A protein has these predicted regions:
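Glycine- and acidic
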Residues: 90-94, 98, 154-160, 268-271
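Conserved, mostly hydrophobic/aromatic
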Residues: 31, 73, 129, 147, ...
C-alpha cells in the first residue's frame, strides 16, 4: 500500500526492484495492503472485487484487488509476497468474522492463481496465505486448513495483537498453527515482545515481523536481556555502561549517558543508535532460540530467558 503510493511500485521496478533500490542483499517480505484494510478503516470500502482506499496522502481513490496486489509485489521485486486479506478488528461478532474469513479465502485463491499466472514461482518468489479468524479458535483452524489445501509455499498468522489480551493472542496463534502443514514456514504477523516471541516459537511459529524495535527506539527505549530501559530516565545521566553488555554491535561503543544526552538534545542519532541496538538484540534472541532448539533444551532456555527479562526492576 505505502510503496504503491510513494514512490510508486513502477518507480521501484524501474530502479531494479527493492533490493537495488535500497542496496539490500537479504530477503525481503512485503505485505499486500491487508493490514491497511484494518488500520485505515475510515478511509476504505471492502467489496468482493477488492478494497477501495482514499489515499492518506491526498485523498485520491486507490483500488487494490487480489490480482493487482500480486502485480504490485512483483514490481517491488519481493522475495515473499503476501496475499490480500482482511484483518479483523477486536472484538468482532462471530457471524461477521465468518463472512470476512470466507472472503479472505476466496481472495487467497485469486492471489494464488495470479501468482502462478505471473510466473512468480519460476522467479524463486514465494507467496504466503494468511490465516484470519478473529478471536474464534474454531474459525482460525478451519481457515488454516482451507489455506493448506491451496498449497502455498508458506503461511502467515494474521489478525493477532490487535487489542486482545495476551493469553487470547497465544490461543489464536496455537489454533491457527494447528491447522497448518508442519513442513511449511509459519509467520506470525505484527508481533511482538521478546517473551511473546519465545512463547509463540514454542507453539510452532518460525517467523515474525514487528515495528516494536524501531518504534520504541524513537521513544528512547532500548531492549536488554534484563528488560527494556528508558533512556529518558535521569538515572542514566552518568551511566558509563553500554546499553547492555551482551548484545554488542556498533551501538555498544557508546555509553548510556551519551545516548541519553542525544535523546535529551533531540538528536536524530539517538534514534539511529537505539534502533540498531534493538534490531541486533532481536536478531541475537532469535539466533539463541535456534541454537536452543538444535540443542534440545528450548523449553528450559526460553523459561529462563523470559524469567530474566520479566524480573527486571528497570523503569519502563
Amino acid at each position: 500500500y505505502h510503496l504503491h503510493l510513494r514512490p510508486g511500485d513502477d518507480v521501484v521496478r524501474q530502479m531494479g526492484g527493492l533490493h537495488k533500490f535500497m542496496h539490500w542483499d537479504g530477503p525481503i517480505l512485503t505485505d499486500s495492503g491487508g493490514f491497511q484494510v484494518f488500520s485505515l478503516a475510515g478511509l476504505r470500502k471492502i467489496k468482493e472485487e477488492g478494497v477501495t482506499f482514499a489515499s492518506h496522502l491526498d485523498g485520491a481513490k486507490l483500488f487494490i484487488s487480489p490480482e493487482s496486489c500480486m502485480g504490485i509485489q512483483k514490481n517491488l521485486g519481493s522475495d515473499i509476497c503476501m496475499v490480500l486479506d482482511e484483518c479483523i478488528p477486536y472484538p468482532c461478532e462471530k457471524q461477521k468474522v465468518i463472512k470476512s474469513v470466507e472472503r479472505t479465502l476466496r481472495w487467497a485463491k485469486r492471489c494464488k492463481d495470479e501468482y502462478l499466472r505471473l510466473g512468480l514461482p519460476q522467479r524463486g518468489i514465494l507467496s504466503f496465505g494468511i490465516v484470519q479468524g478473529g478471536c474464534y479458535d474454531d474459525i482460525r483452524k478451519r481457515c488454516a486448513e482451507s489455506l493448506a489445501e491451496l498449497d502455498f509455499p508458506g503461511y502467515a498468522i494474521g489478525g493477532v495483537s490487535v487489542g486482545e489480551p495476551e493469553p487470547q493472542m497465544l490461543e489464536q496463534v496455537e489454533a491457527s498453527a494447528s491447522g497448518l502443514p508442519f513442513d511449511k514456514p509459519r509467520y506470525v504477523m505484527g508481533v511482538g515482545t521478546p517473551p511473546q516471541l519465545l512463547k509463540m516459537i514454542a507453539l510452532g511459529a518460525d517467523m515474525f515481523d514487528c515495528v516494536m524495535p524501531t518504534r520504541l527506539a524513537r521513544h528512547a527505549v532500548a531492549f536488554t536481556p534484563d528488560g527494556p530501559i528508558n533512556l529518558k530516565n535521569a538515572k542514566f545521566a552518568e551511566d558509563s555502561s553500554p546499553l547492555d553488555n551482551e548484545t554488542g554491535g556498533y551501538s555498544s561503543k557508546f555509553s548510556r549517558a551519551y545516548i541519553r544526552h542525544l535523546v535529551k538534545a533531540n538528536e536524530m542519532l539517538a534514534c539511529t543508535l537505539i534502533s540498531m541496538h534493538n534490531i541486533r538484540f532481536f536478531q541475537n534472541l532469535m539466533q539463541k532460540a535456534r541454537e536452543a532448539i538444535e540443542c534440545g533444551n528450548y523449553e528450559q532456555w526460553s523459561a529462563e530467558t523470559i524469567a530474566r527479562y520479566e524480573s527486571s526492576e528497570n523503569d519502563k
